[in-house]
Amino acid sequence: MDKIFSHGGFSQRLPSASALGKIFSAMPLGDPLYQMLELKLAIYVDFPCEMKPGLLVTCADDIELYSIAEDEIVRFNKPGFTALAHPSPLSIGTTHGVFVLDSHKKSTNSEMETISCLRFLHKPSIDKMRNCGAVLKRQSGCFSLSDPEFVYTDSTYYVDFNTAKSLLNVLKELGTLDCEIDAYGDFLQALGPKATMDYTNNTANVTTKERGLVEVRQKIFHLLHETPLNVILLNNSKFYHIGTTSEYLFHLTEDVALRSELGLMSSAFSGHMNKPSERAFGSCVMYSVLDSSCSVGSGSVVEYCRLGAGVTIGEGSLISSCWVRLGLSVPGRVFMHSLCVNHLGQTGFVTVVFGISDNLKHSVKASANLEGLKLFGLCLAECLSHWETENEVLRFSGDPSSCSLWNACLFPVCTDQQSSFLMSLEMLQAAMQGSTFTLPKETKLISMQESLQFKNLEEMLAFRMGLYNDITQRNLNS
C-alpha cells in the first residue's frame, strides 16, 4: 500500500505554506513540534491493516476526526475507488467535493455505512447540489451536524491496485504532461453511473488554464467512467479545513472544539517567557524564540520566528519564518512571511506582507486596472503612491495577461533577514498610516510567485535548525 499526501499546491490562500507545502504546516502539538504530516499519519494509523494493495490519497490542509462503534472498521478492500465522506453544511460543499448517493441503498443511521455513489460534484453551487440530488435531510441519530439539510463532502480516498495501474498506463500513453491534473476534481468526477463529460471543459476552478487539459481530462474520463465509486459515510465525524490564513488562525487560536479534541497548545516547542500575561489568551506560538518582553495579540499565530526585546504583534496576525528586531510593532490582521532567495546570483531575503483578508488569487487582465486589486484593504494604486512608485513602473511576473497580488513585484530583496522584515514592515506602515516610504535606490522588487521560483530551502531550513538548537538548549537549562 502506498500513501500520497498532496503537498498543497501553490497555497495561495496560505502563503506561509507555499515554500515547503501544506503537508509540512506546523501543528501546535508535540516536542519537537508536529507537522501536518505526523498528524495525518497518526489519524490514519489503523488504515493500512484493513487496506488491500493500492493508493491512499489525502489533502494536506484538512483534519478529519471521526467516531465509529467498536464493532465497525473502516476498510478499503473494494475494487475501484473508495472515499471517506463527512456530513457538512451546504456552504462547505460549495468549496469541496460533494457525493451524490444512491439514496435507495442508504438504509441506516449508524455511525458508519458503505454505499455506492452515483456521481461526484467538484465545488458545486447550492442549486447544482439540489438539482443533482446531493442535498439530504438530517435525521435523528448519531449525526454531529445540527443543520436541517446537509451534503456529504470528500476528504481522503483509496484507489485499488488494478485501477492505479490503469492510470499509470494512461500517463505512459500521454507522455510528459503539459498541464496540471487535480487528484480530486479530474479523477473523481469521472466516476459513478451518472457522471458526465461536462466537467472536462469547465476550467473555472483551474489556477492556470493550460493547453491540453481538456484532452487529458477526456482520456481520464473514458478510462474511469465505469469504475465503481464506493463511499464510506462517517456520520459522526468532523471535517476541519485549515487551508486559508483565516482558517489557520481560527482553528489554532479560537476553535475551542478542535483545541480540546486534539489537545492543541497555545505554546508549542518554543523558547520564551512563561508569564501568561505577556501572551494574550487565544494566541499560538510555535517553534519560535521570543524575548520575555514580547507581546503576542489575541488570535495571532507566530511560527518559526525570532522576536527581539519589546516586539509586539497585533491581534489576528500570522507571522511566519521572520526575524524581528527589538522594539518593532506589527499591526493586527496582517500576514508577514520571510523567504530566503537566490536572486541574480546572490543570496537574499524577501518578506512578503499582505492583509489577512487580501485575495491573492483575484486577478485583473492588465496592469492598467490596478483599482481592481486590494492590498491591506486599500487600492493597490494607493499603496504604490505611498511608496512613491508610479503605476506604470510596477512589474507583474509570469503571465502578463493575469495581474494579481500573487505575481505583483512589490517586495524588496535585502541582504539579511532582519532588514528584509523591517523594510516590508515600513512599507506596510506607510500604506496603513497614509505616510510616505521611499525605497533605497537600486532596490530589486520581486513577487510572491518569484520568491518561490528563487527560494533557497537550504538556508530557510538552516534558520529553523538554529531555532531548534536554541529552543532545545533553553529547555535543558530551564
Each predicted region: which residue ranges?
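N-terminal nucleotide-binding beta1-loop-alpha1 segment
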Residues: D2-S16
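Short, electropositive, low-hydrophobicity segments enriched in small/polar residues
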Residues: Q12-R13, L101, E247-Y248
